Each structure stands twice: as C-alpha cells, then as structure tokens.
Amino acid sequence: MKKIVGALAVFVITYALFSAAGYLFPVDQEWYNSLKKPDWTPSGTAIGIIWAILFALISLSAAIVYAAFSFKGAKSFWFTLLINYVLNQAFSYFQFTQKNLLAASLDCLLVAITAIVLLIIAKKYSRAASYLLLPYFLWSAFATFLSFTINSMNL
C-alpha cells in the first residue's frame, strides 16, 4: 500500500510540476497570434490537449519507475527527468516571456534529446515506463521542427 501511495504522489507531483510553465510563463496570445506560422501548425487547443496527455504519460512513467525502484534505485532516471523538466519549463520562458524564438527552438531541441535519453534510460527500469515516453519524444521532435520553422519564418 505504501508503494501505491508513493507512486500516486509521484504521479500528482510530476504532473503538477510539468504543468507549472503554463502558470509561470503564460502565453501572450496577441504576440503568438501575430507570428507567421506554417499551415500545419496545430491549434492552441490541440497543443494544450496534447501536452495534458503527454504530462499524464510522463507522470505515469515516473510513477511506475518509483513503484519499482523508488528514488535511490533509479538515480539515472530521476536525474535525466529533472534535466528534461528544467529544459521543458525553459521553453515556455524563452518562447513566451523572452519572446526569443531561436533560444526556444534550441531549448526545444534539447528537450527532444533529453526525452529520447530518458526513454532509453527508463527501459533499464521498466519497458512500460519507457514506452509511455515514446509519444513525448515524438511530439518533442515535431515541436522542435515546428519551432525552428516558426523562427525562420519570423526572422
């Protein structure tokens, strides 16, 4: 029972932390809407739904690793997740607070790289935890391409 409660707490805390950027660095809709974007840019609503799902998958992956190995038994997973988390939050800061599209794009690339590293590391602890991170990596790779495209269209 203690592991289940701990895993549930890890899920909730991870989800809340990954969701924090939306509150810490709110989107300046007027500025964002003024940017030139490719026709294949998802709507803001779609992006919000996708991130909500991805945050749940990341959180579930973390909860699975925690339930099986706690924090001490999976240090490489937690360290990589922490780095990825900071980079994930930094994207919103660069994009929406600093309005620096190049910095946001470079940061997004680092998010994608750390997402694939996290996926690989997670596989050492749990295949399920690893597979849950695949959509996050794929979306991060797409977001990187989109971010660099938006940056180039607005030079």
Swiss-Prot record:
* Membrane-related topology note: Multi-pass membrane protein
Q: Which GO terms describe its cellular component?
A: membrane; plasma membrane
Q: What UniProt keywords apply to this chain's record, in alphabetical order?
A: Cell membrane, Membrane, Transmembrane, Transmembrane helix
TM annotation in the entry: 4-24, 46-66, 77-97, 101-121, 130-150
The lineage's top-level taxon is: Bacteria
Q: Which InterPro entries match?
A: TspO/MBR-related_sf, TspO_MBR
Which cell locations does it reside in?
Cell membrane
Q: Name one Pfam family in it.
A: TspO_MBR
> What biological-process GO terms show up in the record?
tetrapyrrole metabolic process
Q: Which family does it belong to?
A: Belongs to the TspO/BZRP family.
**Name of the protein:** Uncharacterized membrane protein YtaB
- Species of the source: Bacillus subtilis (strain 168)
